[in-house]
């Protein structure tokens, strides 16, 4: 590892736990990323795409009716307004540009809710790259609008039936494919997890979320928020929001994991609070495991949070106490999904609804003037059929 240019660890978490065949590919990727970060032409092209293709900066919206407490302002960082419908587009454009810079012709990706797959498909269509997306068969069934969008933009969507047929299995299949094709293909990982250098690359390409939020808050309120809140699955939208605030001790960083049917049941996806450290997906990180060390299946109503591990920087922020991690159940997320629609005319992704749920709960308990910012990581179009079925009493 002495030849690496960046630290592969966040405290004890992270690393590059991959088959030897992939080590040269990861080192090549790290070198290309470091060089691109120092290349003014690359940075200018990335910035131009974010502004003139994706639609940045995104709005910072002060909610009018959501807060249950007159002393508490709740702002929404509107990543739902980004082209593609979620924060995923930020880092996908960055990685796709990086892949072209490296001379790759093909992109391999995994997706859960389909948002990363859609973002990858649009970036590949734009930049003339072949696109292959692995998606758990369960997620293909519950996210049909996004599957159609991907195929419409020219992507090949491959349903994965192994294991639990969800995101972790799609990740494994994508990594397996890449191990045999990395000379021509780039694995465009969709979250701030996996082997080094992916957690660092994804954070840096998502950092724009927190940078804009900080600038917008200073313009609007003349000060920084008291807390920033984001949902956490793998953790890319949250680390994008947190990154520029980590060195601002007055700003509390709050991640919200999916409590599913309840933290006291096996049906959740909260490895930070209820997992044990292990090796998974090329990294050392908190992991949902049984008593024999086998990976337990995670569960969440939201496909994008249905992941049994979490990014290593979140694990480190949790271990050091710089960030705190809470959870919201399916029922709480469903209530927040409906509440935001009724109160503000904004339909959030079910993933983002977990963060909304916690923000409303926190606001209710505040006893002084407080400003909260929630990262509204995506829009809820993809979830309306799932929510409709649940509200109509159907099993999902």
From Swiss-Prot:
GO terms for molecular function: tryptophan synthase activity. It catalyses: (1S,2R)-1-C-(indol-3-yl)glycerol 3-phosphate + L-serine = D-glyceraldehyde 3-phosphate + L-tryptophan + H2O. InterPro entries: Trp_synth_b_CS, Trp_synth_beta, Trp_synth_beta/beta-like, TrpB-like_PALP, TrpB-like_PALP_sf. Keywords: Amino-acid biosynthesis, Aromatic amino acid biosynthesis, Lyase, Pyridoxal phosphate, Tryptophan biosynthesis. This is Tryptophan synthase beta chain. Belongs to the TrpB family. GO terms for cellular component: cytoplasm. Pathway: Amino-acid biosynthesis; L-tryptophan biosynthesis; L-tryptophan from chorismate: step 5/5. The modification N6-(pyridoxal phosphate)lysine is found at residue 88. CDD domains: Trp-synth_B. It comes from Shewanella putrefaciens (strain CN-32 / ATCC BAA-453). Gene3D superfamilies: 3.40.50.1100. The keyword Amino-acid biosynthesis applies. The beta subunit is responsible for the synthesis of L-tryptophan from indole and L-serine. Transmembrane segments: none annotated. SUPFAM superfamilies: Tryptophan synthase beta subunit-like PLP-dependent enzymes (SSF53686). PROSITE patterns: TRP_SYNTHASE_BETA (PS00168). Tetramer of two alpha and two beta chains. Its cofactor is pyridoxal 5'-phosphate. The gene is trpB. Its EC number is 4.2.1.20. It comes from the Bacteria.
């Amino acid at each position: 590892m002495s030849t690496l240019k960046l630290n592969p660890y966040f405290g004890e978490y992270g690393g590059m736990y991959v088959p030897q065949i992939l080590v040269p590919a990861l080192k090549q990727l790290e070198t290309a990323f470091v060089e691109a970060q120092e290349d003014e032409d690359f940075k200018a092209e990335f910035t131009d795409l974010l502004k003139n293709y994706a639609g940045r900066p995104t709005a910072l919206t002060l909610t009018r009716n959501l807060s249950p407490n007159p002393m508490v302002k709740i702002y929404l960082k509107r990543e739902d307004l980004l082209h593609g419908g979620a924060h995923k587009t930020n880092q996908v454009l960055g990685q796709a540009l990086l892949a072209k810079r490296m001379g790759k012709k093909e992109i391999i990706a995994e997706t859960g809710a389909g948002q990363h797959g859609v973002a990858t498909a649009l970036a590949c269509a734009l930049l003339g790259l072949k696109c292959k997306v692995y998606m758990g068969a369960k997620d293909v069934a519950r996210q049909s609008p996004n599957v159609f969008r991907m195929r419409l933009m020219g992507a090949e969507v491959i349903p994965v039936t192994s294991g639990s047929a969800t995101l972790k299995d799609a990740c494994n299949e994508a990594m397996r494919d890449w191990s045999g094709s990395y000379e021509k293909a780039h694995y465009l990982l969709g979250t701030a997890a996996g082997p080094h250098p992916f957690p660092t690359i994804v954070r840096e390409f998502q950092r724009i979320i927190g940078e804009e939020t900080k600038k917008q808050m200073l313009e609007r309120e003349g000060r920084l928020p008291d807390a920033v809140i984001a949902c956490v699955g793998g953790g890319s939208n949250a680390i994008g929001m947190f990154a520029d605030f980590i060195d601002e001790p007055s700003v509390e960083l709050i991640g919200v994991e999916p409590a599913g049917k309840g933290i006291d049941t096996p049906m959740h996806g909260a490895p930070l609070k209820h997992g044990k450290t292990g090796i998974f997906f090329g990294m050392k990180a908190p992991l949902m495991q049984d008593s024999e060390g086998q990976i337990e299946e995670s569960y969440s109503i939201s496909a994008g949070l249905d992941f049994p591990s979490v990014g290593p920087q979140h694990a480190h922020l949790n271990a050091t106490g710089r960030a705190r991690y809470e959870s919201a159940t399916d029922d709480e997320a469903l209530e927040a999904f409906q509440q935001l629609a009724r109160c503000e005319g904004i339909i959030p992704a079910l993933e983002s609804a977990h963060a909304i749920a916690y923000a409303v709960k926190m606001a209710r308990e505040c006893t002084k003037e407080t400003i909260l910012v929630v990262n509204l990581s995506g829009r809820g179009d993809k979830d309306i059929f799932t929510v409709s079925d649940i509200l109509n009493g159907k099993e999902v």
